[in-house]
């Protein structure tokens, strides 16, 4: 299976002679669960990856045959990272099948460093404007393109698909520099949000 977000029934796990394998888009044991790419970006991780592992009764807990790491760029969105991993991690499955045929045994996952990546719900991606700008940026990138981070202004919900944190040398209008948390400042081509 590939990026399967559920559990295979126990009675089916032993049906294939060599068991089941799954291609999972995280560096296990970090980010077990349904939304590993999104959760990695939201947490500010600097790297992600993919693992091919043997399925067991517990979610994403089986021993690992092969893995690969990719850096997460400072502007990378979940959609972009998913596309990259779908393209570059696929050969891991073919190599794993060759390993199984050759009798290679998978390596058990560490019991340390386990994190869970639950499915993303709309409430998980609501922007708290009192948060630090970097946290908001991670949230927006992790939720882009879907489900999309959102905020409310005048009782209207709107999605934000791209953000960029201002840096010390950036030139901005004085109204932007003094914006309070939650205050929006519009210029001709940009919209700025004051953060906590």
Walk through the language-model features, giving the residues of each.
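An anion-binding loop in the catalytic cleft
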Residues: 129-196
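Donor/substrate-binding cores of folate-linked one-carbon enzymes
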Residues: 3-116
